[in-house]
Amino acid sequence: EVQTGKGIFVKRNTISGSIYFKLVKINYLEIIEIKAFLEQKVIEKIIHSITPAQCEKLECYLRAMESAAKDDVYSAADDFKFHKIIIDASPNKTMGQMIFELRKVLDNYAMEFKDTNSTWIYTIPYHRELLNAFKEGNLKKACDAHNKIYKTDISLFSKIDSQRK
């Protein structure tokens, strides 16, 4: 929409109440902490409502990850799809968008370094624990499995940070 007056005003095509944030100074360990907090909230929201069909899709992507891991390959694409199913199951779509944006920042940063996949491959059994917890509807087990993934992420990004210094 364009309005005339003293100059031209071009209205941004946004939804009322939308927020956009740009990180000026980035602490990647803090971003992981924020992402993990939001993911934990998603787990809490969906633990009793995730459907058998969603669990079946999670199983499919997890099997692909496990199969690739046998050849010492970490399938980032299947990992993304696995987590997308979980996040998309949440009724809070804004939270999901924030998680994906934070993940993009972290993925771009990690791509600068070698051997990140050799660390993330160790999270695959924790993904299995998470899926089993979803199937059982067991919040404590789901949070414990997620926490193991989070600690692996922290360990990896701590190594990356120390390499940069």
PLM features: residue spans?
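Short linear motifs at protein or domain termini
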Residues: 1-38, 163-165
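Generic C-terminal helix-cap and adjacent flexible tail
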Residues: 155-165
